[in-house]
């Protein structure tokens, strides 16, 4: 894993963008796809550095997933990004049939998840995405705590062959994880105590 890490407040989408560039530098099979949100999903630098490995599908989230599934069948590792309200929101059927049931190595990236969407408003608030994706067979769901964990999650996803959903947020948040021990499916203890246990996603 690269030595680059986040120490100042940053959005998890920033960690995704940095992590995607890092894994693409190491693995030529990594490709990026976006549904007309390249800047918002922090894929602009990836597009500039790897123009032959970036596909802009436009406002077509169902096609985003279909193209990603085809690339996975061809041996690529596609990271397909849009706002969570649109993917999985608008593309759940394609995710269900083409990715989850087929157990394809597709990484679905949902940005602006949750209620803090800034000026984008209530129509862009993805509140059901975790439930939608957790109900699918073979699908792994990852919700990083901060930008550094999001960066590490991208490395873990690139090395994992299962379909996965990476849920990202819009606002800048403090960095609370500082070690390189992110593992898919394993919790991290951030602070030891004896009086109470807080389990957060």
What are the functions of these language-model segments?
Residues 1-167, 172-173, 181-186:
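Thiamine diphosphate
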Residues 27-28, 191-196:
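A short, charged/proline- and glycine-enriched loop
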Residues 198-201:
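Glycine-rich phosphate/diphosphate-binding loop of Rossmann-like nucleotide-binding domains
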């Amino acid at each position: 894993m690269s030595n680059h890490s986040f120490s100042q407040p940053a959005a998890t989408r920033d960690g995704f963008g940095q992590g995607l560039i890092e894994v693409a530098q190491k693995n030529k099979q990594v490709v990026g796809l976006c549904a007309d949100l390249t800047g918002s999903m922090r894929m602009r630098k990836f597009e500039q550095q790897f123009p032959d490995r970036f596909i802009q599908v436009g406002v077509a989230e169902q096609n985003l997933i279909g193209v990603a599934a085809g690339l996975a069948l061809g041996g690529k590792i596609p990271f397909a990004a849009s706002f969570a309200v649109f993917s999985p929101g608008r593309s759940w059927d394609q995710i269900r049939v083409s990715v989850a049931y087929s157990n394809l190595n597709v990484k679905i990236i949902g940005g602006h998840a949750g209620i803090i969407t800034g000026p984008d408003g209530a129509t862009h608030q993805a509140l059901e995405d975790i439930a939608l994706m957790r109900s699918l067979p073979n699908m792994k769901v990852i919700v990083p705590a901060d930008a550094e964990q999001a960066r590490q999650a991208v490395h873990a996803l690139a090395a994992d062959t299962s379909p996965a959903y990476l849920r990202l947020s819009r606002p800048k948040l403090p960095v609370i994880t500082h070690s390189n021990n992110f593992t898919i499916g394993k919790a991290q203890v951030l602070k030891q105590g004896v009086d109470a246990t807080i389990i957060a996603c």
